[in-house]
């Protein structure tokens, strides 16, 4: 028993469970002075925003202080990563502390937009001042977002899984309810349900295959014995981005939806804004095509976030490693980036077919939105499980060695 509790993996796991208890407890703290009987307070975007909030640690159903979730932080990470590719801005050349501070400023700006959009549309109880309630709830929602960011950082340093655990628990708590409500709303024949179950099994197999498949690049390591050289490889995933594109595209596309809600409240009689908001509404052709395009784009972007050729080439050069037939430095970086680009396109096409293809059914019936998002949900869920599994496996690896003395 003492040996079990002395395990690093067990200690980190228990700390993660403690943080999850805090998260679940906070998600039950309801925003004050709000009429909870009104469910469709965000108009036509309620279903999508509630679903996307559940994927990012939020919950627009219970209207708690964690309703917005980690969506502002995730959207800020996407924008920061895009800005970092610009050499003119020079964001990546600044100190780490400055970069973190600027990312938090960007997170705050997005959190203000989303929190204010939600607060302005909240059904406030008539006996209280609407302005004060909106102001107070906006501050509470922003504070809830930053509290979740803090919990994620704590879990990354002292627990297992980082922010993934919070997102995973939110999905487990909220998504099944959304799916069951869809089956109650939309009549689906039994034969179609059986077919969907079979397709789910096939999709799960393909998903595991894509996540575990690796392209091995032989690497020569200085000081490694000749008989071990055949085991020395640089591994590149067949789908380098994994399930991250789907997770972040849901967060990223929710920002314009919140922005349109906010602008619609500020300019209620603006015909151009109303027309644009209507065209970009969830389930409309413009939104579906943008969703599929951004999903493919994020598949490429996050592939390079996961496998950065410059960083890998620099690390190999410093440690005296090199790829057979490739000069160290710039040539190695170019070689790795070409491979990553090639596999990111393959992964992007896989993501578009599996997670983007079902969204085309939404063009015929918007009630199928939640069901159409299930394949992408599987991709996101599978990526999280594999990530946590690999982290636990790495923690337990050090415990397999016995001390010499």
UniProtKB/Swiss-Prot annotation:
**Cellular component, GO, one term:** plasma membrane
What is this protein identified as? Answer: Accessory Sec system protein translocase subunit SecY2
Q: Where does this protein reside within or beyond the cell?
A: Cell membrane
- Subunit composition? Component of the accessory SecA2/SecY2 protein translocase complex required to export cell wall proteins. May form heterotrimers with SecE and SecG subunits.
Principal localisation: membrane
The transmembrane residues are 14-34, 63-83, 104-124, 131-151, 156-176, 191-211, 247-267, 285-305, 343-363, 368-388
Q: Which organism is it from?
A: Streptococcus pneumoniae (strain CGSP14)
- Keyword Zinc-finger: yes or no? no
Keywords, A to Z, come to: Cell membrane, Membrane, Protein transport, Translocation, Transmembrane, Transmembrane helix, Transport
Q: What does this protein do?
A: Part of the accessory SecA2/SecY2 system specifically required for export of possible cell wall proteins. The central subunit of a protein translocation channel.
- Protein family according to the UniProt entry: Belongs to the SecY/SEC61-alpha family. SecY2 subfamily.
Q: Which Pfam families match?
A: SecY
InterPro entries, alphabetized: SecY/SEC61-alpha (IPR002208), SecY2 (IPR014269), SecY_dom_sf (IPR023201)
User: What is the protein's membrane topology class?
Assistant: Multi-pass membrane protein
A biological-process GO annotation: intracellular protein transmembrane transport
